[in-house]
């Protein structure tokens, strides 16, 4: 005995519902994995940026004044950006990834509904086959045939009722799925817009801090660091003394102690007396 048109329609309906559930399970699962990976990579980017902030601060401590100030302010802005990125990660996790994960349990419930429907359909098909077999074996036994017809009628009514319930359930499922799709992607775009809006503000400030670095001033500081003030003052004193010595240089007079000067004078007088005696002897 072939299926009735109503049974064939219910089978086609169940098959279509099953394909729809399979489709949602496949693509929502893929979306969930991809969004989760997106969040993980964003979190890793936040961690790398934290390392960058730390290194910029460390390097800034070794630099000249305006470079140091510019880098410190830049690092502060970059750290602020990571706070916004952390908020982005948390919002994506709670508003996008988690709702997608919840579809795992939703799909499981729909499969159970489909299983109940298929069981009812199989029971109907079994009763229909039983009735056909009874008619062939006992065509004159109206009691057995009537009982088989009653069982088939009951199975058909159950299958019809369960199919109606499944149709209503899947209709609600599709309605909720469409709302969730709209909400999930709206949340994703909104979260990204908020983050990138804040990022533009923060990065603009960071850019300005770098532009505020005074290269000429810091270059002068660096040059002065090559000639410290103490070294320069000593160098100036040496140069000044050198110039003074060259202009005041003249004949040198060797000073003698008083004792030496008296001794020399006595020796000179003795020499003069000897000269006088010699000259007198020559005259005689």
From Swiss-Prot:
Residues 242-261 have a biased composition (Polar residues). The BAR-like domain displays limited similarity to other BAR domains. It comes from Xenopus laevis. It comes from the Eukaryota. Residues 242-284 are annotated as: Disordered. It is a peripheral membrane protein. GO terms for cellular component: centriole; ciliary basal body; ciliary base; ciliary transition zone; cilium; cytoplasm; mitochondrial inner membrane; nucleus. The keyword Transit peptide applies. Residues 267-284 have a biased composition (Acidic residues). Residues 142-184, 260-284 form a coiled coil. This is CBY1-interacting BAR domain-containing protein 1-A. Belongs to the CIBAR family. GO terms for biological process: cilium assembly; inner mitochondrial membrane organization; positive regulation of smoothened signaling pathway; spermatogenesis. Plays a critical role in regulating mitochondrial ultrastructure and function by maintaining the integrity of mitochondrial morphology, particularly the organization of cristae. Plays a crucial role in ciliogenesis. Plays a key role in the correct positioning of the annulus, a septin-based ring structure in the sperm flagellum, serving both as a physical barrier and a membrane diffusion barrier that separates the midpiece (MP) from the principal piece (PP). Residues 1-48 form a transit peptide.
């Amino acid at each position: 005995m072939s299926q009735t048109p109503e049974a064939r329609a219910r089978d086609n309906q169940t098959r279509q519902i099953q394909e729809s559930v399979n489709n949602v399970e496949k693509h929502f699962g893929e979306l969930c994995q991809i969004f989760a990976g997106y969040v993980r990579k964003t979190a890793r980017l936040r961690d790398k940026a934290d390392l960058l902030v730390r290194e910029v601060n460390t390097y800034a401590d070794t630099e000249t004044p305006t470079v140091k100030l510019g880098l410190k302010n830049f690092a502060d802005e970059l750290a602020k950006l990571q706070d916004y990125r952390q908020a982005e990660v948390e919002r994506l996790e709670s508003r996008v990834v988690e709702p997608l994960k919840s579809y795992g349990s939703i799909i499981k419930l729909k499969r159970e509904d489909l299983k109940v429907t298929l069981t009812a359909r199989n029971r109907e098909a079994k009763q229909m086959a039983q009735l056909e077999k009874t008619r062939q074996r006992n065509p004159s036994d109206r009691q057995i045939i009537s009982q088989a017809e009653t069982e088939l009628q009951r199975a058909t009514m159950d299958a019809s009722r369960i199919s109606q319930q499944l149709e209503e359930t899947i209709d609600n499922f599709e309605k909720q799925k469409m709302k969730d799709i709209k909400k999930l992607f709206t949340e994703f775009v909104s979260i990204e817009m908020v983050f990138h809006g804040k990022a533009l503000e923060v990065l603009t400030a960071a850019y300005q801090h770098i532009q505020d670095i005074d290269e000429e001033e810091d270059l002068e500081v660096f040059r002065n660091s090559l000639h410290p003030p103490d070294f320069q003052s000593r160098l100036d004193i040496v140069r000044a003394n050198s110039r003074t010595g060259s202009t005041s240089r003249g004949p040198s007079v060797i000073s003698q102690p008083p004792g030496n000067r008296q001794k020399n004078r006595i020796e000179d007088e003795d020499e003069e007396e000897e000269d006088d005696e010699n000259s007198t002897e020559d005259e005689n």
